[in-house]
Amino acid sequence: MKHHSLIFLTGFSGSGKSTIGPLLANSLGFEFIDLDREIELAAGKSINRIFAEDGEAAFRELELRTLERIGSQKEMVVSLGGGVLENDRCFELIRRTGTLVYMKSSPEILSLRLQHKTDRPLLKGPNGEKLSREQVEQRISEILEKREPRYQKADLIIVTDSKKIGSTVEEMTRKIERHIRRVERDS
């Protein structure tokens, strides 16, 4: 069953999901959870360790099981991992159970936000070396091109490039509340 007050935040790493998510949840009076953190708690180890020790298939299965558990919740904001929508089963589950919000940012802004992060595999070369900002921006563009068709299927799209955090939270709160009211009225 679809719960329109179950809000899934998607977007590229650096789009603001983890920063804005808790503030948005507070503004809406909802609970906040980070999907990756929930997976780590369930597995008892970090996502990097899950990938290294168990492989991507095991991680994707944990991701799906965690989403299935979350899918029955209401009044919750869930920050999704960057690649979750690439998994067809996860994508369909999210679309079927909640409201998907795409936090859209340009490759230029994302590369600026991510340039000092050292824990992101996408920011490293094949031998673990740090990439230049231009290389990071190019890599982000390539990944976004692949993910964009799924991102565009979101119920709401919010551009997070040049806004202050507070105004982004206000805009998202307004749009989500309006969306929930409209969908509930039309049901």
UniProtKB/Swiss-Prot annotation:
Its cofactor is Mg(2+). Mg(2+) binds at S18. Binds 1 Mg(2+) ion per subunit. GO terms for molecular function: ATP binding; magnesium ion binding; shikimate kinase activity. One of its GO terms (cellular component) is cytosol. It comes from the Bacteria. Belongs to the shikimate kinase family. GO terms for biological process: amino acid biosynthetic process; aromatic amino acid family biosynthetic process; chorismate biosynthetic process. InterPro entries: P-loop_NTPase, Shikimate/glucono_kinase, Shikimate_kinase/TSH1, Shikimate_kinase_CS. Its main location: cytoplasm. It catalyses: shikimate + ATP = 3-phosphoshikimate + ADP + H(+). The gene is aroK. It is found in: Cytoplasm. Keywords: Amino-acid biosynthesis, Aromatic amino acid biosynthesis, ATP-binding, Cytoplasm, Kinase, Magnesium, Metal-binding, Nucleotide-binding, Transferase. Substrate binds at D36, R60, G82, R147. Pathway: Metabolic intermediate biosynthesis; chorismate biosynthesis; chorismate from D-erythrose 4-phosphate and phosphoenolpyruvate: step 5/7. Monomer. Its EC number is 2.7.1.71. This is Shikimate kinase. ATP binds at G14, S15, G16, K17, S18, T19, R120. It is an enzyme of class 2 (transferase). Catalyzes the specific phosphorylation of the 3-hydroxyl group of shikimic acid using ATP as a cosubstrate. It comes from Chlorobaculum parvum (strain DSM 263 / NCIMB 8327). Gene3D superfamilies: P-loop containing nucleotide triphosphate hydrolases. It holds the Pfam family SKI.
